[in-house]
Amino acid sequence: MHPELLVRKRIWLMTLVLTGLFLLAAARIAVLTTSEAASLTERGIRQWTKAGIVTARRGTIIDRKGRTLAISATAYIVTADPRLVSDTERFLNSIEPVLNINKEAARKRLQDKTKGSIILKRQVSRETVDALRQLRSDAPEDSGLKALSFDEDICRYYPYGALLSQVLGLTTVDSEGQSGLESRYEDVLRGTEGSYLRQVDARNRQLDGTEGWYIPSQQGCGLVLTIDAEIQEMVEKAMRECIEVNQAQSVICLVSDVKTGAILAMCMNPCYDPNDPPRNDAETLTELMRLTAISDVYEPGSTFKILTAASALDSGVTTPQDSFYCSAKITVDGDTIRCWGRPHGAETMADGLKNSCNPVFVELALRMGTDTFYRYLTAFGLGKKTGIDLPGESPGILITSRNVKRVDLARIGFGQSVALTPIQMMMAANSVINGGKLMKPYIVSEIQTPDGETLERFHPTVMAAPIRPETSDTMRLLLERVVSEGGGKNAAIAGYRIGGKTGTAQVYKNGRVVRDTHIGSFYGFAPVNDPQVSILVIVKEADVPIDYGGTTAAPFARQIMQEMLPYLGIDPENDEKDEEIEVPALKGLTIGDAKRKLSQVGLESVTDGANTVVLDQLPPAGAKLVKGGHVMLYTAGSEEMTPEELVCVPNLTGLGDVDCARLVRQRGLTMSMTGQGLCTEQSPAAGEYVQPGTTIFLLMAGDDE
């Protein structure tokens, strides 16, 4: 081919190629500047800018005297740029000992190289961040630690630790209310988030001379509680001792202002530290966060007799001097209901309350009848929520009036066949002794701005007036006698007029009564002439030989009141300090010697009756009781028993399970029961001599109370 033609052909071909490339480039530019423009712009902005949320500080929660119970503190978010991490394992192994992260979850996030920043951990302390900064500064370039960056975050801090933990509640890592007041007042406590945008280099460092924008967050409003942190500390200290001494499954204690319904303390043990909750064990955390004082129901037992007595007096079916007779049992429509102990014989209504006599309260309930009794029970707030400002409240259980049987009514009279929450029991009992007003319990007294200005103030609310003031006056005196002469002696405090009532309730599991397992409780108030404060202590499933409320709950109510009353400025009415007696040391003594020693100083004893030597005592040596107070003597398992000594088997025929257990333990024997009700047969027979520790087999039939 002619050289000139060849050159022209090459020029033509080159022109076509260049034209094609130009057209392709133009088309690509057109695409980039039209359909892909937005996404490319966004990607570019992500590369040289960093945007984020400014977490709002939650409102502060303080007690009634201004002490901080919950506050938002500065923490940090630790992030990393996956694009700067070439060796993921080396990177994670370097930071894990300091940051304590979930390596598997972090590994997955770091594998996404399309993101410029991933969160490794939130709510990290300043100390940890400082350690990471030092680690990053000292690390070589190829370590990947230059990918780390830190931003301010907010965490919730509880200065008193586990104190009031269930009531205050918990927040999530995102600073959202999860339980307790944190959840109930989420809309009040949470603030308004802010945001920011800044220009950064490839290592997420802000570029000098560049501008961004920053919208600050707004702190949430705060809460002022009716809780007194100092009283709460008194209560929690006593409840820790209570659960340990009684080896109880759990304990609850409420303290309230009798006249207003304000809650001064609320303790539920076991508890947890909200600064370090077991977040990795959801089941355990859920159980620990439960507000059992308002959500769990229980048969109140004899503390309920406060309500029955008040109803009967107010309705006119009885008077304090009214005569009754207790033969240790009473039959209602063929159902035999037994008293808790030996027959009380002839007694007045006032004696019946002091003695906590079941037959007296059965008769009072039947005298009133369904319509009258239920009118009072409804006025006391039973069967409905109290309205306390906490989440998860239960209404309790009350058989409807149209479905209640006569025997049900009889049992309700002494605290069975009815279930209340602790807060219901306290508020109802308060109305009996505060002049007859059922108050709505409340725990938040004010909502405040972040600057401390009051936005809303909550006032005492009267929900009903169950009884007349005159009836309330009478009930206060009757309940004072329970503490001074009856089963509440262990709650007496020298110089103070204390009223109250003990209770021992059955425990149900799978719909059946659990043998030898009870809920002991004590409700008390002071001073009797002008009640200011009340207390309710509930001890669930104590693992001690005698688990009545008078021995498991009352001593700890006394311990709290003895410290709390002077703190509240409630002075003793007299200086009868000589009536306060120091409990002597009794361990190692025989039962006879221990009883004589107690009698000499003016104290009384209660024993499990198992053996002959005192192994332990409650209250311990050195504690103070008023004259006539009870000291528990524990003898179970004494090594002083002689194995060869024969024991005479007692006659148990016709006795109930409680009396059988008492007599059997007194002889150092054990027993096994079949059936429910009263003993109809036993083996070995009464009068036979057996070795200590022998099991007596009992056949029970008839009523099971």
How should these model regions be labeled?
Residues M1-P278, D371-G383, G392, A491-A494, ...:
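Periplasmic/cell-envelope proteins involved in peptidoglycan metabolism and beta-lactam response
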Residues H2, A70, D201-Y214, C253, ...:
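Beta-lactam-recognizing serine transpeptidase/beta-lactamase-like catalytic domain environment
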Residues V54-R57, R64, S72-A75, K115, ...:
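Extracytoplasmic
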Residues A56, P82-E89, R122-R126, S175-S179, ...:
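Soluble non-cytosolic domains of exported or imported proteins
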Residues V78-A80, R122, D187, L225, ...:
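Preference for bulky hydrophobic residues occupying beta-strand positions
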Residues P82, L99, R136, T171, ...:
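Conserved NTP-handling cores and scaffolds of large molecular machines
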Residues L148-F150, C253, F324, I498, ...:
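Generic structural signal for residues in well-ordered beta-strands
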Residues G495, K509, D516, V537-E705:
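Ligand-recognition elements built from short beta-strands and adjacent flexible loops
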